[in-house]
């Protein structure tokens, strides 16, 4: 499970957004047999923009001064690939969305051309799995518009550590994947979140409260509003729609 922190302009222009610099990496390696977790974290000296944008510093608490003595992208990637170990034992490298991989590709290309080193992505690109895409295939559409922190809350878990710390982000992504992989009830509850928005919540303005009542029943066994009751109400909304 891997996460990058990026230094990018606060712009709505998607092309400009893809010019982001990688400034930190966090990853955890989870052994499915032993349940052992290993950690990797490093700052990364930026290639394009040496100054950290104010909104990025506020989010990540990474300063321009922090990055002045940070290891280069090439150095960090050599350490990271060594830390990954035997590629034959890797089931996947999991990210939350495709922006991390997009910026990784761009930085890898620029650094390779500028510093004449091999493309580090060449041997690992096929291992990448977008967690959002994985659970969209289950019908969990809210993965596209709900944050990792909120997804954990809806899964009856709290985010561990500081958000926008790449190591904590990677660890919490692992926790979310573990929960959703093993617990169909939680997946179904996340699928239900899609009914709690327009136009459905305009047809039944009590649907949010009903979903919360079911959450109490699901996670805390409070009340008696169960999945059958909620399903009937949802079918009624869809029928009226």
Predicted ranges, named:
Residues 11-13, 67, 137:
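A generic structural signal for short coil/turn motifs at secondary-structure boundaries
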């Amino acid at each position: 499970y891997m996460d990058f922190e990026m230094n990018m302009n606060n712009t709505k222009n998607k092309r400009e957004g893809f010019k982001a610099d990688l400034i930190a990496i966090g990853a955890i390696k989870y052994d499915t047999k032993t349940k052992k977790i290993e950690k990797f974290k490093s700052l990364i000296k930026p290639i394009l923009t040496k100054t950290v944008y104010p909104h990025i510093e506020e989010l990540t608490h990474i300063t321009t001064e922090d990055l002045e003595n940070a290891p280069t992208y090439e150095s960090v990637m050599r350490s990271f690939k060594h830390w990954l170990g035997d590629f034959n034992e890797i089931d996947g490298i999991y990210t939350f969305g495709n922006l991390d991989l997009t910026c990784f590709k761009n930085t890898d290309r620029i650094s390779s051309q500028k510093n004449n080193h091999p493309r580090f992505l060449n041997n690992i690109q096929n291992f990448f799995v977008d967690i959002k895409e994985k659970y969209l295939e289950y019908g969990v559409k809210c993965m596209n518009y709900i944050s990792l922190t909120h997804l954990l809350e809806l899964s009856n878990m709290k985010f561990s550590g500081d958000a926008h710390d790449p190591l904590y982000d990677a660890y919490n992504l692992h926790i979310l994947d573990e929960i959703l992989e093993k617990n169909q009830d939680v997946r179904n509850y996340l699928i239900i979140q899609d009914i709690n928005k327009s136009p459905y919540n305009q047809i039944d303005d009590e649907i949010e409260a009903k979903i919360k009542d079911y959450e109490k029943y699901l996670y805390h066994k409070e009340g008696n509003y169960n999945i059958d009751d909620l399903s009937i109400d949802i079918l009624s909304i869809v029928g009226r729609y």
